[in-house]
Amino acid sequence: MEKRMELLPGVTLTAVQTEKFKTGCFSINFFRPLRREEAAMNALIPSVLLRGSEGCPDLRAIAARLDELYGASAGTLIRKKGEVQMTGFYADFIEDALAGEPVFAPMMDFLGELLLRPRLENGAFLAEYVESEKRNLANAIASRVNDKRTYATGQLVKTMCAGAAYAVPRLGELEDVEPITPEGLYAQYRKVLAESRVELFYMGRKSAEDVAEQLRRVLRELPRAAAFDAVGTEKQRAGGDVRRVEERMDVTQGKLSMGFTTGCTAGEAEYPALLVLNTVFGGGITSKLFTKVREELSLCYYAMSSIEKNKGVMIVSSGVE
């Protein structure tokens, strides 16, 4: 059974009660407009928060606390949907009934402490943690080129959607990481807490009402602004002349990516027809791209198409020897 309810202004819970699993899961996501000036900072915040809190000041203490909760796990979430950047935490934990004692409530307390009571130094994030996570983020951004398939698609999006928020990568840009300071990151963290819409998700054996009661208690100190930053995605419009970009690299297999505007996004009357078109064109092993271009003509190692339902874009990816 699924229920949605608003716990606090701009904070919504989706709870799915089920007896199917031995573990429960929970996530908290902050929705931010995808902007280059804050994308890298938003991506950095969850990692810094997960380095230490007032009660668990370092990774060893955090690991010990998770072990006490029957080997529960917690991690960071950084996603991009259309022109919305979503960051936060997720957690998996054993059900109370199987543990023989409460696990859900202390797990929520732990996540609440990580989120709302981070380890600080002189009114800002601990510099050691910020610098360490900056290096990790910079390495993650720089390593995108190692996955040529994903890199080619990313470069296509940057070219096709140049000037639009959708061109901003999920983790931000490499050159925006180094200037981040502990003070600036903490100020952005406070802004994210107060001005973002928040989506909570729970799946497990507890009722939505029980989950809501615990979360209202845990999040009672969450600051809430009078208004929240609007999030949404502007449909991609046709760009006129065809644009071609070529990057030369020493690789054994070239990557060819093509982008098309569809003029249609999820929720529109024509969207189901677009899904069927994508399936026929390149969305599976029975599609034309697979059966004709790959199998019959042997023109490429792989060829597929996908729909970005929030932006109104179709992307074709292929590997060419």
Kindly label every feature range from the protein language model.
Residues 1-72, 173, 186-292:
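His/Glu-rich zincin catalytic helix
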Residues 14-16, 22-42, 59-113, 149-172, ...:
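M16 family metallopeptidases and their MPP-like homologs
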Residues 52-55, 96-98, 117-126:
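Short, polar/flexible loop-turn hinges at active-site or ligand-entry regions and domain interfaces
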Residues 63, 117-141, 229-237:
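Acidic/histidine-enriched alpha-helical segments
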Residues 108-120, 217-226:
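A common structural junction motif
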Residues 121-125, 140-143, 171-177, 201-202:
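Flexible, glycine/proline-enriched loop segments at strand-loop-helix junctions
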Residues 128-131, 135, 150, 154, ...:
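An alpha-helix initiation/capping motif
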Residues 136-151, 296:
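Short acidic/His-enriched helical or mixed secondary-structure segments at domain edges of catalytic enzymes
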